[in-house]
C-alpha cells in the first residue's frame, strides 16, 4: 500500500517487530527512493503469521535505493535472533514447572509477547491479572482491535488474585527497564497497593 504526500509517494512494507503491524517506508522521490526501516527483526515464524516482506525490500534494492536508513537491535552481533515463538515455548515450560506466583514484565507495546503469556497461563490453568496503566490500556485497545485474543476465563482483576492459590497466579506488568514508578518497581519495594 502507498499514499501520496505532496511530491512524494510513500510505500508501506511489512516488517516484524515487537509492535504489531510495523512497517518500513519506501519514500519515492524524483531524486530516488529512500528506505526507512524503523526497528525491525527478521522472524520467519512470527506470532501473527505475517513475515517481513523481504521480497519487496529485495526488489527495491535491485531498482536502486538512494538512501537506506535501517535500524535493528543487536545488528552488530553475528547470527540470528530467535523467533518470538521461542519465548512462548519458554513460558510454557516455566508455567508448567513453577509452583508459585509468576510475574512477567515486558514492554506494554509487545502485544504478541503478552498474548503468549495469556495462552501459556490458560493452558496451565492459571489466571492472569494485569497491572500498570500502560499495560492495562494496551490490553484494552489491542483486544478491541483484534490484535489480542484473551482465552475465556483467564483474565481476572488484580484484586481477585488474593483469593487464588499462588500456583494459579500470573501477573503481567510494566517495568521491564526498572522504571522507578512502574508497577514492577513498586512490587519489588512493597509499595504496590494490590500485590504483596
Predicted regions, residues:
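His/Asp/Glu-rich metal-coordinating catalytic cores
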Residues: 1-164, 176-194
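Short, surface-exposed beta-edge/turn micro-motifs
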Residues: 167-169
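Short beta-strand segments
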Residues: 172-174
Amino acid at each position: 500500500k502507498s499514499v501520496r504526500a505532496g511530491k512524494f509517494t510513500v510505500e508501506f512494507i511489512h516488517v516484524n517487530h515487537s509492535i504489531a503491524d510495523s512497517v518500513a517506508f519506501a519514500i519515492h522521490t524524483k531524486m530516488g527512493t529512500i528506505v526507512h526501516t524503523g526497528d525491525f527483526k527478521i522472524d520467519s515464524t512470527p506470532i501473527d503469521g505475517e513475515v517481513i516482506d523481504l521480497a519487496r525490500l529485495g526488489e527495491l534494492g535491485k531498482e536502486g535505493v538512494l538512501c537506506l536508513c535501517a535500524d535493528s537491535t543487536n545488528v552488530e552481533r553475528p547470527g540470528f535472533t530467535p523467533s518470538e515463538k521461542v519465548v512462548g515455548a519458554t513460558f510454557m515450560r516455566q508455567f508448567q514447572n513453577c509452583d508459585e506466583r509468576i510475574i512477567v514484565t515486558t514492554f506494554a507495546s509487545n502485544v504478541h509477547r503478552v498474548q503468549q503469556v495469556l495462552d501459556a497461563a490458560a493452558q496451565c490453568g492459571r489466571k492472569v491479572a494485569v497491572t500498570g496503566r500502560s499495560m492495562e490500556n494496551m490490553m484494552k485497545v489491542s483486544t478491541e482491535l483484534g490484535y489480542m485474543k484473551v482465552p475465556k476465563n483467564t483474565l481476572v482483576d488484580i484484586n481477585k488474585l488474593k483469593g487464588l492459590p499462588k500456583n494459579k497466579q500470573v501477573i503481567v506488568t510494566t517495568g521491564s527497564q526498572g522504571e522507578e514508578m512502574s508497577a514492577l518497581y513498586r512490587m519489588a519495594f512493597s509499595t504496590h497497593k494490590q500485590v504483596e
